[in-house]
Design a protein with these regions (language model features):
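N-terminal leader/linker segments that precede catalytic domains of diphosphate-processing enzymes
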Residues: 3-175, 179-193, 200-311
Length: 311
């Protein structure tokens, strides 16, 4: 079986936080949490009802975390999606003999009015051994990446972006990619938009192939690059088009990106046959594997006739 193919595949809707929240420890009604005006009062906290948990789960703000940030974290799509995942078929609280007792909200990074990144620690215990399961979480949510293959004069090329990646302290060659910035989970629309922003290439929506949709449904039909510490789920897409030699030359070394968002991007075009040796990007290597195996199994949709990539 495969995940359903199609261009309307979206992330499942998240339940409102009100369906999870039972009470706040400070008592009373109103906001999710309420910090006391007394300087010696404990940090903001609340309890949430999580189906599958032994009882109400306490959520606490780390020392120094403002009440406003704590409230935004509790209300964020990132936090609600993580709680939802606990209850899925392979969820920690449904598939294994694990219990969740407390969550410590440690940090919040805002992208404008939206919570972009969330850092928290979950106390999860194996019910049989009573041993704690590593529970440090860097939540960043849903993302997309696109393997762009351009054919020119009998040669197939892949388009990569080169940009500074501060967490690894280096510049990195990788697939054009981006984060989903809303709760609707529009993977295909985001993929097309990110490619245009990062490369200047205008893609035809109907020509996009969702490679991760070819996975078995039990996988969730997304790629998880670092599940030991990060919740990121990536939808990998394929785009195939034909271009002339002048277009390939114009793309090579082209500087792109949204400068106002700190994106300083340079394009690199490499022969597809050398792509697997040209980058250490997990998105690219995963996309290559999916693309090649789908071709081998005969389940890759045929490329659209006469599809031209436009700049």
């Amino acid at each position: 079986a495969q995940c359903l193919l199609g261009f309307s595949r979206r992330a499942p809707p998240l339940p409102p936080l009100a369906s999870l929240l039972i009470s706040r420890l400070s008592g009373g009604a109103g906001a999710v949490c309420m910090a006391s005006s007394d300087a010696a009062a404990p940090q903001p906290s609340a309890t949430v009802a999580v189906p599958g948990a032994a009882g109400p789960v306490r959520v606490v703000a780390a020392p120094g975390l403002p009440e406003a940030d704590f409230r935004k974290a509790m209300d964020s799509a990132l936090f609600r999606r993580w709680l939802e995942n606990l209850q899925t078929e392979k969820g920690l609280l449904t598939y294994g003999k694990l219990s969740l007792t407390q969550i410590l909200i440690q940090g919040v990074d805002m992208f404008g009015e939206r919570v972009g990144f969330l850092k928290f620690k979950a106390d999860i215990v194996d019910e049989e051994t009573k041993a704690k399961v590593p529970g440090i979480v860097f939540a960043r949510g849903l993302a997309v990446a696109v393997l762009i293959l351009l054919e020119s004069k009998g040669q197939t090329y892949a388009v990569l972006t080169e940009q500074a990646r501060v967490p690894i302290g280096k510049f990195m060659l990788e697939l054009p990619a981006g984060m989903l910035d809303d709760e609707k989970g529009d993977f295909v629309g985001t993929a097309v938009r990110e490619v245009e922003e990062e490369t200047g290439i205008k893609l035809n929506l109907e020509d996009m192939v969702d490679l991760t949709a070819l996975l078995d449904p039990t996988t969730g039909c997304r790629m998880f690059p670092s599940p030991g510490g990060c919740d990121e789920e990536i939808g990998l897409f394929l785009y195939r088009g034909r271009v002339d030699e002048e277009t390939i030359n114009a793309l090579q070394g082209k500087e792109t990106g949204l400068r106002e968002h700190g994106e300083l991007i340079k394009l690199r075009v490499v022969p597809y046959s050398q792509l697997w040796r040209s980058t250490a990007d997990a998105k690219a290597l995963s996309a290559i594997a999916l693309y090649e195996m789908a071709k081998k199994e005969g389940i890759l949709p045929l490329p659209p006739r006469g599809s031209l990539a436009n700049l």
